[in-house]
Amino acid sequence: LLRAKFKLYLDMRFKLIGDVNFSVEMQLINDKKNYSLGPHSDHSRKVISALLYLPKDMSQQKIGTSIYIPKDPDFISSHKEYGHFKKDLFHKVITMPFVPNSAFCFVKTNNSFHGVEPLEIEDTDRWALLFDIFISEETQLREEEAKTKFK
C-alpha cells in the first residue's frame, strides 16, 4: 500500500538501479517531557517512514512530528551527513496533529526534513509505532554507483 501511494517518488529514486531489495523495521517508542528531535532527513537507506500515533486522548494534539523546509533553497542533506541540523536553518511548515487513530507517512529524500519540537507537557507519554522501510546495503551500493555513473 505504501509503495503504491509513493510510486512516483520511488520510481524517481530507483529508476537507474533495477531490482531493489527492501527490509522493514518496527519500533514502539515512548517520548517523555523535554524530548526533542532537530530537523533531519534520516539515513540514506531509509525509503518510507510511517508513524502511527497512539495518544490516549486529544490532549496531546500539538506534539506531533513537524515538517521543515530549509531557509536556503539549495540546502540538501547528503548521505554522509544525515544528523540533526540547527532549527534556525529551517522554517517549520506544519506540526502533524498527534491524535488518536492517526498516522503520518512520508518518503525520505535529501531535501525532506522532519523533527519533534520540545515536549513541554507535564507527564508526557508520547507513544507511537514507527514502521520504516529501508533498502538493503547491496541496493544502497548500487544506488551510489548509479549516482556516480550518471552525474
Model-identified regions with their sequence ranges:
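Membrane-proximal basic amphipathic "stem/tether" segments
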Residues: 145-151
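Catalytic core of non-heme Fe(II) oxygenases with the double-stranded beta-helix
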Residues: 3-145
